[in-house]
Amino acid sequence: MFRKILFMVLALSICLPTMCNAQKKEISKAKDNVKAGKSLEEAEASMRKLLTDSANKDNEKIWLVLFDAVRKQYETVNEQMYLKQKADTSKLFLAAYRMFGVLEGLDSVEWNLKGVQPAKMKYRKRHAEYLNQLKGNLYNGGLFFVGKNDYKNAYSLFAAYIDCAKQPIFAAYDYQNNDKRIGTAAFYTVYCGYKQNDAERTLAYADVAQQDTIRLIMTYQYMAETYRQKADTTKFVEVLESGFARYPQSKYFFSHLFDHYYKQSKYDVAIALCDDAIEADTSSIVALFAKSTVLLAQQKYNDCVSICDKVIEKDKNFADVYLNAGLVYFNQATYIERTMRHSREKTQKLKALFKKALPYMQEYRKLAPNEKSKWGIPLYTIYLNLNMGREFEEIDKLMKK
């Protein structure tokens, strides 16, 4: 047993210097490449590989060489652009993005090594000043990638821009209170996440995005659609309500909220919603039509047809409102037919109601010829009861197809 332990100790004592020498050579090679301005991506990759070893994660020298490798890539592209040479703009922005990651990581390492004492931090002030000058590249780079429909990279840059406000290295700059573009950057993370169909990314900075009041209406819509796709009805409705409260003239928030309340048979809430929308925009025929739909469901027929006629006055081509008005009379007629005993009075009432329903249903058919499932049976019944032979024969053949 003793021999085995002794052998292991000897083997380790032989391997450690070899490993250290190999690591030193790798660092030295990377430094030489950076100094010569060649194989910069290779130098960056080798330093990142070293940092994957937990034994190296606190090695400041590796972090600094890594930073120099990335910085040199950034400066190379920047120089090409300055000299108006052919340059890959995306490489400039991505190198800037990686520099932030490297120096923020080094700052964390130094903080831990120095025993959480800011006064002993050797690099923080210098690196913070350097990155502060480049911070705009994260924002502009995000816009650049949005323009290229590269939403993945755009999201990464905007997220890094926002996170600067939380990074200890930038504490002296108080970005949270001094940077007015954080809200807009957050909006773009919502947008990019939505375009990637990534719910987690869409919602990650959604609260911050609401600081951008200019684009708030779009933020609410992307949030609402994301919650709807997640089948999170509670959050979906909450966002819709917030959106409608701020933008009562928006058809998006109104229509989706109305559909929710109507399907839940919350008719009083739906009516109140319609009234708020009408108050906000008296010319809104959508809200008027929606209100007529609720009144029809509540069997408040006189109020319903009154509103339908108002909509028709405003827009004679609004097809569905003719259906609602026609159903006001048709539904009453079918109810009488089911409940009243046969009599002359019953026949007279039926004919009177069917005659009132007729022009609305005919106009609905004219405006919505493909909606046979909605106008077919009502017109068939009306023609039959009003003894309209020619019209009845035509629709009878149509219904049998």
Residues covered by each model-derived region:
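Canonical positions in the second alpha-helix
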Residues: L50, Y161, V208-A209, S242-G243, ...
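Short coil/linker segments at helix-helix boundaries
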Residues: A69-N149, S156, C164-T184, F330-Y360
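Start-of-domain marker
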Residues: Q23-T89
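Structural marker of alpha-solenoid helical repeat scaffolds
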Residues: D53-A55, C164, D212, R246-Y247, ...
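Residue-level recognition of tetratricopeptide repeat
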Residues: N56-N59, P168, L216, S250, ...
